Curated annotation (Swiss-Prot):
HAMAP family: NQOR (MF_01017). NAD(+) binds at residue 12. This is NAD(P)H dehydrogenase (quinone). GO terms for cellular component: membrane. InterPro entries: Flavodoxin/NO_synth, Flavoprotein-like_sf, Flavoprotein_WrbA-like, FMN_Rdtase-like_dom, NQO. PROSITE patterns: FLAVODOXIN_LIKE.
């Protein structure tokens, strides 16, 4: 069985919703075992609550377990064009995996969210840098998801990976089109992983 991990950080629930859609898409692939986990929260609980953070139910991952998966699909909100501090802190703990080459050749893909759309592509491509140092095979989604051609409404989604636009106050939830792109990303990456493990 090919093991696929959807690993995310979500403060307000947008990336959590996208992660579920990515996992739903990946689960369509025969031969793929899909696991959804989150990275640990680094904010003090009182500050997280005061900021309106949403309680997450997914189990917390450890950096060492990344070596157990054939493909990892990372989800992170944008922080000034980069991954969130929580995801950065988690990945900064993977030095031992890097030293041993434990992630070399594993598939990696990234999805993201932004407040207003600024930085969504940059967040994905800047995350790729860390994954490339691990020797992971980076999987963009291209334009195969037909929703990427729809310009009739505001929406996220890029050839680099699925995205959602949360709005400046976070009130906008992922649209059906954005979730469809996320499902496509999960199915596409899981399908490639199964073929490579074939």
């Amino acid at each position: 069985m090919t093991k696929v991990l959807v690993l995310y950080y979500s403060m307000y629930g947008h990336i959590e919703t996208m992660a579920r859609a990515v996992a739903e898409g990946a689960s369509k692939v025969d031969g793929a075992e899909v696991v959804v986990k989150r990275v640990p929260e680094t904010m003090p609980p009182q500050l997280f609550e005061k900021a309106g953070g949403k309680t997450q139910t997914a189990p917390v991952a450890t950096p060492q377990e990344l070596a157990d998966y054939d493909a990892i699909i990372f989800g992170t909100p944008t922080r000034f064009g980069n991954m969130s501090g929580q995801m950065r802190t988690f990945l900064d703990q993977t030095g031992g995996l890097w030293a041993s080459g434990a992630l070399y050749g594993k598939l990696a893909s990234v999805f993201s969210s932004t407040g207003t759309g600024g930085g969504q592509e940059q967040t994905i491509t800047s995350t790729w840098t860390t994954l490339a140092h691990h020797g992971m095979v980076i999987v963009p989604i291209g334009y195969a998801a037909q929703e990427l051609f729809d310009v009739s409404q505001v929406r996220g989604g890029t050839p680099y990976g699925a995205t959602t636009i949360a709005g400046g106050d976070g009130s906008r939830q992922p649209s059906q089109e954005e979730l469809s792109i996320a499902r496509y990303q999960g199915e596409y990456v899981a399908g490639l992983a199964v073929k490579l493990n074939g």
